[in-house]
């Protein structure tokens, strides 16, 4: 698992292909987030060794598809399919739990726009939206990000039918799970549960 993480990190730092100084399609992203009023991300909100923070600071190359003051979307340098892209917040949050709801909302609000453009550009039929949150879920870069993975019929990437699934048993165990989740939700401050109007 560690070797895989290292390989993916290296692939994001050193994308395969032409030298970025000679290829005009490779762009280094700037750090415009507007968070400090001068258009720059404050250095305290970025991590020195995070590959995505390096991209945001302009220290590593990327193929940028979209950018605004909250997030950017880049092509994944180790794609599962043609057009596999990542939506990344411009500030460093290691996991989804640590990412403020407003940042998650800003990232998710871009999904229809970006995914539609990617699906059209790649001639895909559909796409998967994926978040690997935590090591056990396969997260290898600990900077929150959302994968947009374009799909075509019979692409053999994976199918939900290929996963071993079991019917939910409406039993005591399921009821206990529902009660436990509800207790955790009830323990949250009300402002976290109420959506702004």
UniProtKB/Swiss-Prot annotation:
It is found in: Peroxisome. Residues 51-158 form the HIT domain. Residues 14-43 are annotated as: Disordered. GO terms for cellular component: peroxisome. The active site is at residue 145. InterPro entries: HINT, Histidine_triad_CS, Histidine_triad_HIT, HIT-like, HIT-like_sf. A motif (Histidine triad motif) lies at residues 143-147. Substrate binds at residue 147. It holds the Pfam family HIT. Keywords: Hydrolase, Nucleotide-binding, Peroxisome. One of its GO terms (molecular function) is nucleotide binding. Its EC number is 3.6.2.1. It comes from the Eukaryota. This is Adenylylsulfatase HINT3. It comes from Arabidopsis thaliana (Mouse-ear cress). The gene is HINT3.
């Amino acid at each position: 698992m560690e070797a895989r993480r290292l390989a993916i990190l290296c692939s994001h730092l050193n994308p395969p292909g032409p030298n970025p100084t000679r290829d005009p399609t490779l762009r280094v992203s700037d750090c415009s987030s507007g968070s400090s009023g001068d258009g720059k991300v404050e250095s305290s909100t970025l991590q020195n060794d995070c590959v995505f923070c390096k991209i945001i600071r302009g220290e590593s190359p990327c193929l940028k598809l979209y950018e605004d003051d909250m997030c950017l979307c880049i092509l994944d340098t180790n794609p599962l399919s043609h057009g596999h892209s990542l939506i990344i917040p411009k500030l460093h949050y290691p996991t989804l739990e640590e990412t403020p709801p407003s940042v998650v909302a800003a990232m998710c609000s871009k999904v229809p726009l970006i995914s539609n453009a990617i699906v059209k550009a790649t001639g895909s039929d559909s796409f998967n939206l994926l978040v690997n949150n935590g090591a056990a879920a396969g997260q290898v870069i600990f900077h929150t990000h959302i994968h947009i993975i374009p799909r075509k019929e019979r692409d053999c990437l994976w199918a939900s039918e290929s996963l071993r699934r079991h019917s939910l048993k409406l039993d005591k165990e399921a009821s206990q799970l529902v009660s436990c989740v509800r207790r955790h939700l009830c323990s949250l401050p009300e402002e976290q549960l109420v959506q702004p109007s």
